[in-house]
């Protein structure tokens, strides 16, 4: 029996995290489907182990599927991962030595051990030592076979010698992906190249070779998964050691209420990797630029206008695809042909035929000034006259939207320009302003109450 156990363990470890299928979610976790294969397993009861698991495994998630005729008698997970916190917390009442900053040493019986301090019973005194002063804690112990990762253990029963094949499935934190878009505008017209990409991150402590990767866009509900804890020795979300750009692209399909992207090639997904892949091929699109001047009813100020870009997610506009939420980096091609960064914004999940609104920053040559010309408040009413001036020093014609937020029960009177009531507290004035020109809007709002 012992020979068969050793053979099964060795065969499995040779294929550690190899040729797995990983479904990656934006919530910071992944579903891993790891193929397993043991040749020439003898008949009878055998115990097998697998320890190539992420330390942030959801402990109630793993399950092993094998051929129909194979019986898995039980499954156990050993998650007693070593940490100094747990080790010394179990040494209460034992003799320890402590060396603090400056070289002084204390010894005695350990009474208390926590994140803030360590308390000792000395020969004739009780000592409380802050943790940040401690350089070394010593105890006469030897740890046999410390465990650094969770281990899965199964017992299977075979009627005859055979090859055992199956799949280990589990959920783990430590994996993530985010969409990143590069919007490259030519600066001459309202046309741009949109490059939809994804950055996938391995923040676990397991390498994956020849990995098939799928990305799911959508917000999933969680019941509160249990993760393996190792005291204060939590796995560090270290800075990535390398960024691998790839020509790998993804095939998008629906997955129930979500969307799933399957990468076209297998990848090596190593610890601390950040890998950039294409979600879609680059698209040539059109956008609409509008300058926004937005104020509340009592505001008086002068400032540059916000630059807003609107993109229609339609086939006619080169898109018509589900756009995952993610950061949009905007670039502008200068007259000399060089590419310059011109701002960034966050794109929310946008379905087909939806509208994307992006803020690129504030315009240098386009300013707005809002002035309250008159304000009169009586016992049962309030009235204010507003003047708004937009200056376009730019050498191009522009579109402007002047947005006014007015609370309460109001009416607009004597508006000098056409406006639209957007909702109960918002109106806006759409304007077209010629190059090197300006436009002035005036209006009065009145409120009455009993």
Where are these regions (language model features)?
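Basic side chains
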Residues: 2-3, 439
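Sec-dependent N-terminal signal peptides
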Residues: 3-13
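Long, intrinsically disordered, low-complexity accessory segments associated with secretion
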Residues: 15-450
